[in-house]
């Protein structure tokens, strides 16, 4: 697989789970002989929801909730066939969304 890169984009709500999964992917890729660029932290997407505290009156009393989506980007440069096999068999934590582009 000369001259080819694998781009992996990870998303999760919990940054600790995301960083652990990133470390696992990096160690697997390095162990099989590929070089890794990253992890690059991408901007965190923050969604805020504002709702009334009471169900009926008191419009001024509100509560805000937010949902943060953390993202990381990894590039695996010149992957070997062993790297691809190891990444396919890798079992990541629940709650981590993985997008892979060749």
Swiss-Prot record:
Q: Which domain of life is it from?
A: Bacteria
Instruction: Name the Pfam families for this protein.
Output: Ribosomal_S10
**Ribosomal protein among the record's keywords?**
yes
Task: State if Lipoprotein is listed as a keyword.
Answer: no
Q: Which InterPro entries match?
A: Ribosomal_uS10, Ribosomal_uS10_CS, Ribosomal_uS10_dom, Ribosomal_uS10_dom_sf
Keywords noted in UniProt: Ribonucleoprotein, Ribosomal protein
List the molecular function annotations (GO) for this entry. Answer: structural constituent of ribosome; tRNA binding
Biological process per Gene Ontology, one example term:
translation
Q: Where are the transmembrane segments?
A: none
Question: What is the recorded function of this protein according to its Swiss-Prot or TrEMBL entry?
Answer: Involved in the binding of tRNA to the ribosomes.
Query: Which proteins does it associate with, and in what oligomeric form?
Result: Part of the 30S ribosomal subunit.
Which HAMAP family does the record cross-reference, listed alphabetically? Ribosomal_uS10
Q: Which family does it belong to?
A: Belongs to the universal ribosomal protein uS10 family.
Protein name per Swiss-Prot or TrEMBL:
Small ribosomal subunit protein uS10
